[in-house]
């Protein structure tokens, strides 16, 4: 005899399946009592940090005149690459991502120096007083620029199955085309922020909004030239991340920690929205080129597909992001004879990074576009192809 009760009625009494379980911080969120990094009590004499950044995308860094910045009211410390005791790098995989630009600037908004002052507004005003002399160099700003120059942050990758050239040549129908999708800012409500508090024996405690505390710990230790176990990183909660705080937070935590180490005082670096959007990576923009062969029923017989992404000036996570775009390029379709070419383009723009989907949406976009184009050529509904 069949039991007519629903699955929820049949579940054990202690089961959490189907049960209403409130989010751990739900009441704090709706009441406004949830604490984020900027809500934490600041130690007495906390310094506030602002960044001086490159105004152009590519150039030779000649001189940095910081005299007016150092003399500005409230300024306690100014830092450049020369003041880093450890490594000037926060690259998560490839070591090509400097904390401060050194000798060359590679994107508009790249940090060149930092100012620490007794008040955040004093630091920001002082940062604007610096004179940075840069000899401009030609800038590659688009995917097309980078492809023409064969400029890549990582070597191209190629995946082939079957004989796509033969399949395309023998296909009864064939179309080719191009497409592009743009990047996207994460626009988390809580911007990038770090509060570094120096401890005993060169130790450092950092409160920050990050998706990867372990990576921040390693990067700060490398920059300060101390052991990783001397760095504690704490993230109570984030006001949004979406991939934008996976690797990007490390640089700002390192700068706050450098100020704290140099002065022996707590240091907070909190980007305003404009600086955040200018100096942090986005979703990767992609350009596509495809050549597809198919039959009268819309069945794909052969495909040659090129995926080229704008990675920015450094590798960051562009390797795995582009790999995943390749892995998702077939989506749910069978491609018997296919060649996929992935180009990870180096441009003089901010280094793009992780974003929800991590390359998957960009990969699936291409094949869904191709399905739509096949349907249009056959005058059929895409759902019938």
Segments the model singles out, each with a brief description of its role:
Residues 1-159, 174-177:
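Flexible, low-hydrophobicity surface segments
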Residues 19, 25-28, 32, 159-194, ...:
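Glycine-rich loop/linker segments at domain edges
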Residues 79-110, 151-152, 215, 233-254, ...:
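Short, surface-exposed loop/turn segments at secondary-structure boundaries that line and modulate
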Residues 80-81, 230-236, 264-274, 301-306, ...:
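Beta-strand segments within the central parallel beta-sheet cores of soluble alpha/beta enzyme folds
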Residues 145-224, 383:
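Helix-loop-helix junctions that connect adjacent transmembrane helices in secondary transporters/permeases
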């Amino acid at each position: 005899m069949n039991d007519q009760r629903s699955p929820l009625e049949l579940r054990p009494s202690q089961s959490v399946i189907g049960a209403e379980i409130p989010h751990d911080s739900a009441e704090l969120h709706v009441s406004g009592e949830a604490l984020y990094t900027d809500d934490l009590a600041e130690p007495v004499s906390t310094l506030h940090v602002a960044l001086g950044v490159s105004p152009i995308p590519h150039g030779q860094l000649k001189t940095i005149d910081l005299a007016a910045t150092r003399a500005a009211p409230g300024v306690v410390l100014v830092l450049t690459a020369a003041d880093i005791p450890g490594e000037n790098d926060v690259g998560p995989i490839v070591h090509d991502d400097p904390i401060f630009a050194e000798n060359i600037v590679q994107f508009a908004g790249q940090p060149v120096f930092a100012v620490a002052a007794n008040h955040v507004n004093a630091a920001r005003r002082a940062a604007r007083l610096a004179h940075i002399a840069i000899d401009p160099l030609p800038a590659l700003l688009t995917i097309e620029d980078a492809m023409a120059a064969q400029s890549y942050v990582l070597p191209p990758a190629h995946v082939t199955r079957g004989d796509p050239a033969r399949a395309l040549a023998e296909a009864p129908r064939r179309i080719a085309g191009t497409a592009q999708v743009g990047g996207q800012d994460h626009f988390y409500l809580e911007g990038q922020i770090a509060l570094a508090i120096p401890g005993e024996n060169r130790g450092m405690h950092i409160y920050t909004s990050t998706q990867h505390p372990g990576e921040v710990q390693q990067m700060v230790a490398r920059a300060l030239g101390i052991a990783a176990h001397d760095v504690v990183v704490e993230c109570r909660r984030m006001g949004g991340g979406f991939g934008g705080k996976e690797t990007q937070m490390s640089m700002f935590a390192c700068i706050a920690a450098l100020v704290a180490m140099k002065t022996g005082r707590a240091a907070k670096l909190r980007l305003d929205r404009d600086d955040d959007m200018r100096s942090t990576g986005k979703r990767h923009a992609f350009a596509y080129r495809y050549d597809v062969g198919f039959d009268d029923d819309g069945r794909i017989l052969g495909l040659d597909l090129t995926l080229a992404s704008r990675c920015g000036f450094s590798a960051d996570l562009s390797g795995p992001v582009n790999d995943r775009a390749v892995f998702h390029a077939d989506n749910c379709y069978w491609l018997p004879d296919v060649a996929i070419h992935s180009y990870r383009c180096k441009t003089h723009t901010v280094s793009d990074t992780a974003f929800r989907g991590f390359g998957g949406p960009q990969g699936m976009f291409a094949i869904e576009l191709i399905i739509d184009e096949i349907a249009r050529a056959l005058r059929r509904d895409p759902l019938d192809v």
